[in-house]
């Protein structure tokens, strides 16, 4: 009996908790670069990239070769028991790429949430303080601490009770929705006045470009003001680059373009080229704040994932993927603005590098998010062979996270499909 999407999704429903969501009713069978085929043989252009995990594409040959070579040597020891060179080398290479002219160290773990959890642990240990300030619209993960940091309750933490204490919420700057940079800084000052003194705050954590929140790009001026505020009060600045990192924004880390040096940087997703690896990198004296045994994990920094990540770094250099990311982003934004010129429902085209999004409003009114239309476009695009992702606090944003290795012809085809969807539905 041949497999179908429907039959496998029925099995999924019976076997997998409903809390594990499903964006598209599709079961993937194989993939290559920016193309995915489902179990029924249908072909899709992938503008989702596993949610920013596949900047180097599905199954990049050099990444797969590195993994195969590592599998022939060593699959696991637990780094805390027996060290191995791929972890050490990757820690060195990430430290070279993190902004800052000072000694750095790198912790490797497995998921983005785990990286953020450890960044908070390190910040608290280094400062002797407990408080953390995060922003409205932020997304930092699905573990309890990261849920507390995340600035959206539904669907992430609804019904789960109180989140961990010591977390305070500042306004994220977003001129489109009436929150200026001054408003954001003032909201932090209000926290200092009303909720926690500056000397009780260990860290401020921020995404250089908000991910799930809607791809709002923080300006260079705002990031510099935030850096100055942290320096004034001895607060550590954590840049959550889980989604922005690994070249998505046209530089390896987005903060390179924003004029600031974070104390700690988290990374994950595309660093592993499809393999699970993440980490925290930062000033050596801060990273060393926790005593031996306080950091790590059984699978943290798997030798297989480290081999994949090292190959990803080489691919970025050999194939000039930072430049390619910028070029893909420029063409993408130009194509989206062409669609916008015909359809005023697109209120904004924005992004940094190839981390690009469009935001839709009914009748062009920024007080009326067009969430229903976004949902319809995502469905129609899939029916036409294009995989899209939505996001945003109001569910009215379409984000684009295709591999930066996508061929030009396929990028153009994807844009043409998207234009058709707007012509039919908007």
UniProtKB/Swiss-Prot annotation:
Listed GO CC annotations: cytosol
Alphabetic keyword roster: Aminotransferase, Pyridoxal phosphate, Transferase
Keyword Transferase in annotation: yes
Cofactor(s) this protein cannot do without: pyridoxal 5'-phosphate
Gene Ontology BP terms: gamma-aminobutyric acid catabolic process; L-lysine catabolic process
CDD domains to which the protein is assigned, alphabetical: OAT_like (cd00610)
MF terms (GO), sorted A to Z: 4-aminobutyrate:2-oxoglutarate transaminase activity; 5-aminovalerate transaminase activity; pyridoxal phosphate binding
Binding site for pyridoxal 5'-phosphate: 112-113, 139, 240-243, 298
Entry's EC annotation: 2.6.1.48
Catalytic reaction equation(s): 5-aminopentanoate + 2-oxoglutarate = 5-oxopentanoate + L-glutamate
PTM-bearing positions, type N6-(pyridoxal phosphate)lysine: 269
Pfam families (alphabetical): Aminotran_3
Free-text function comment from the UniProt entry: Catalyzes the conversion of 5-aminovalerate to 5-oxopentanoate.
UniProt similarity note: Belongs to the class-III pyridoxal-phosphate-dependent aminotransferase family.
Name this polypeptide is given: 5-aminovalerate aminotransferase DavT
């Amino acid at each position: 009996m041949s497999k179908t999407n429907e039959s496998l999704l029925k099995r999924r429903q019976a076997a997998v908790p409903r809390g594990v969501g499903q964006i598209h009713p599709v079961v993937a069978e194989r993939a290559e670069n920016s193309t995915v085929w489902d179990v029924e043989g249908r072909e899709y252009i992938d503008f989702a990239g596993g949610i920013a995990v596949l900047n180097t594409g599905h199954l990049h040959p050099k990444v797969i070769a590195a993994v195969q070579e590592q599998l022939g040597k060593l699959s696991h020891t637990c780094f805390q028991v027996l060290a191995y060179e791929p972890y050490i080398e990757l820690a060195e290479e990430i430290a070279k790429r993190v902004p800052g002219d000072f000694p750095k160290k790198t912790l490797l773990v497995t998921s983005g949430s785990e990286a953020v959890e450890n960044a908070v642990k390190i910040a608290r240990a280094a400062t002797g303080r407990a408080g953390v300030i995060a922003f409205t619209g932020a997304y930092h993960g699905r573990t309890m601490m990261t849920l507390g940091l995340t600035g959206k309750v539904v669907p992430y933490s609804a019904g789960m009770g109180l989140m961990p204490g010591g977390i305070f919420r500042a306004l994220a700057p977003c001129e489109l929705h009436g929150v200026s940079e001054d408003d954001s800084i003032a909201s932090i000052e209000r926290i200092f006045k009303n909720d926690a003194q500056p000397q009780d705050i260990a860290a401020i954590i921020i995404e250089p470009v908000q991910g799930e929140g809607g791809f709002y790009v923080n300006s260079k001026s705002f990031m510099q003001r935030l850096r100055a505020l942290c320096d004034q009060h001895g607060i550590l600045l954590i840049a959550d680059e889980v989604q922005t990192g690994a070249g998505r924004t046209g530089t390896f880390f987005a903060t390179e373009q924003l004029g600031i040096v974070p104390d700690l940087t988290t990374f994950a997703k595309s660093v592993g080229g499809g393999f699970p690896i993440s980490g925290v990198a930062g000033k050596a004296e801060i990273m060393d704040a926790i005593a031996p045994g306080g950091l790590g994990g059984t699978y943290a920094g798997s030798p297989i994932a480290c081999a994949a990540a090292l190959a990803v770094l080489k691919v970025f250099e050999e194939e000039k993927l930072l430049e390619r990311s910028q070029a893909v982003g420029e063409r993408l934004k130009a194509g989206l603005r062409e669609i916008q010129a015909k359809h005023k429902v697109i209120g904004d085209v924005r992004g940094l590098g190839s981390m690009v999004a469009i935001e839709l409003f009914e009748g062009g009114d920024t007080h009326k998010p067009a969430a229903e239309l976004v949902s319809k476009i995502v469905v129609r695009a899939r029916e036409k062979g294009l995989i899209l992702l939505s996001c945003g606090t109001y569910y009215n944003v379409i984000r684009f996270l295709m591999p930066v290795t996508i061929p030009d012809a396929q990028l153009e085809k994807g844009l043409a499909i998207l234009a058709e969807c707007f012509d039919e539905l908007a």
